């Protein structure tokens, strides 16, 4: 996987190209637009502790998941209930029945529909979904059913978009289906590396759907990413490593497949990282 540093190089190259284009009032001016204000910060979290830390840090919206080590799955009813009770910011619930690809069986689709109904009953403000066909296109029929079941909640299409066959056609399909935003890294390993594609998607969307960059977004690259792409929302985990307070640690027994990390440490959103992102976006 390319390093995040290469993403910063992509953004620097785009900004340099923009400056050259600006001398002749060329297309480069798109990349030098002032920072849109305000920029909404969405924190992707998979635990109550991460959700609380994100809210304290100033996140304006939560994507609530479980199991981010597998890219995220649907959170428990208990996690959603406690988040609803303790947070006063919108909560969008990930609807994903398992890790792996985004080609689902009829039984898995039934689970997704039921999870949407329960998220609505629990008071979620939005859901995050993604379904593909075997040929890599958006599964329009199933996405339409998910969107209809979710209404009147907000609907985001998640990073299944990043592994679809044709991003431009997929974006038009999602607009036609009434999806309100797309979470994407620009079909690259990280959003900074996919900044050029994200910028093109923003131009294609032309206000018809929100483009939400996510993947590898940090306090150090978020301002440049926003300037290079023209997005009005950003998505990040802001995670650091939490180490267990257990003093007794059994040896030779693993409960889950968590290699290479020990079961006595895990990722948790850090309040300070969210604060830095929020402050950076306010101050530019």
Please identify what each model-predicted range represents.
Residues 57-62, 87-90, 123-126, 149-153, ...:
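Glycine-enriched alpha-helix->loop->beta-strand junction motifs that scaffold or abut catalytic
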């Amino acid at each position: 996987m390319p390093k995040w540093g290469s993403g910063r190089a992509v953004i620097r190259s785009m900004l340099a190209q923009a400056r050259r284009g600006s001398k002749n009032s060329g297309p480069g001016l798109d990349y030098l637009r002032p920072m849109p204000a305000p920029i909404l910060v969405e924190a992707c979290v998979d635990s109550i502790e991460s959700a609380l830390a994100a809210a304290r840090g100033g996140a304006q919206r939560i994507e609530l998941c479980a199991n981010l080590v597998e890219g995220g799955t649907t959170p428990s009813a208990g996690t959603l209930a406690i988040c609803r009770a303790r947070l006063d910011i919108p909560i969008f619930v990930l609807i994903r029945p398992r890790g792996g690809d985004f080609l689902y069986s009829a039984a898995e689709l039934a689970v997704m529909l039921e999870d949407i109904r329960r998220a609505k009953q629990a008071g979620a403000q939005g859901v995050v979904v993604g379904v593909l066909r075997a040929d890599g296109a958006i599964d329009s029929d199933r996405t339409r059913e998910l969107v209809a079941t979710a209404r009147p909640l907000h609907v985001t299409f998640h990073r299944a978009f990043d592994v679809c066959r044709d991003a431009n056609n997929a974006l038009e399909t999602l607009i036609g289906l009434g999806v309100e935003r797309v979470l994407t890294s620009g079909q690259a390993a990280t959003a900074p590396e996919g900044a050029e594609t994200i910028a093109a998607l923003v131009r294609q969307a032309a206000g018809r759907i929100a483009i939400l960059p996510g993947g590898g977004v940090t306090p150090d690259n978020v301002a440049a990413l926003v300037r290079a792409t023209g997005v009005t929302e950003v998505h990040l985990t802001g995670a650091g490593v939490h180490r267990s307070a257990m003093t007794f640690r059994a040896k030779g027994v693993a409960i889950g497949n968590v290699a290479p990390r020990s079961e006595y440490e895990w990722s948790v959103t850090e309040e300070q990282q969210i604060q830095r992102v929020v402050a950076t976006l306010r101050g530019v």
